[in-house]
């Protein structure tokens, strides 16, 4: 167990360093390159939309589970797994909203209320606690959501780890290639979501049906 947490800590620190490198060196030229190569390609925007699925269904799923529990439903096995998924996504997107406001990063492209962006205005940077949708690129919400799902199912359904990794990878690739987000945004979202999903499994679920850790 200690070895697993040690390895996870090492990987998290490595990703944090990589995120910093992206912000300082990679994000700007990569976004400009993606814009030239794939500007507004529907294929990449479609991949990015994978991350919208858990964003749309997590909170309603918890409400439905609560109502079902009120009427006598007692989840077992897979039921607790999907409750853990919905809870992880809900917590993760709450955290990412706070971080978006705290970091105040501008977007690669202009998409709302003439927000300043790298591609349209040459604006690139962080304006902490600026507020507004135009200053909320970091971290990526779509990547955070799909990574939170993966963070639970990676241990709960380990035989499908290839699928969870693929879904996160496709979402992240679509966001970066479609210049919806910078690479650093999706790496930060992936780290936040996955760690939140993993941490959710430590919550006190009923012992006999506790999601695998």
Protein language model annotation of sequence segments:
Residues 65-102:
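Interfacial segments of alpha-helical transmembrane regions
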Residues 12-20, 57, 85-93, 186, ...:
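Alpha-helical transmembrane spans of integral membrane proteins, capturing the lipid-embedded, hydrophobic core
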Residues 17-24, 89-97, 168-180:
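Aromatic-anchored segments of alpha-helical transmembrane domains
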Residues 41, 76-81, 157-163:
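Membrane-helix interface segments
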């Amino acid at each position: 167990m200690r070895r697993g947490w040690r390895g996870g800590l090492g990987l998290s620190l490595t990703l944090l360093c990589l995120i910093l490198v992206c912000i300082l060196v990679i994000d700007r030229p990569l976004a400009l390159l993606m814009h030239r190569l794939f500007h507004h390609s529907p294929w990449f925007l479609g991949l990015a939309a994978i991350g919208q699925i858990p964003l749309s269904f997590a909170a309603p799923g918890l409400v439905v589970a609560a109502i079902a529990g009120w009427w006598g439903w007692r989840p077992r096995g897979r039921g607790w797994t999907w409750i853990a998924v919905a809870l992880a996504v809900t917590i993760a997107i709450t955290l990412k909203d706070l971080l978006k406001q705290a970091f105040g990063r501008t977007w690669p492209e202009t998409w709302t209320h003439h927000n300043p962006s790298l591609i349209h205005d040459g604006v690139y940077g962080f304006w902490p606690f600026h507020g507004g949708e135009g200053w909320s690129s970091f971290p990526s919400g779509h990547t955070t959501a799909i990574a939170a799902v993966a963070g639970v199912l990676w241990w709960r359904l380990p035989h499908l780890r290839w699928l969870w990794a693929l879904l996160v990878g496709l979402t992240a690739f679509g966001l970066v290639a479609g210049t919806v987000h910078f690479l650093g945004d999706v790496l930060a979202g992936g780290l936040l979501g996955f760690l939140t999903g993993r941490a959710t499994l430590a919550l006190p679920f009923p012992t006999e049906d506790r999601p695998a850790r």
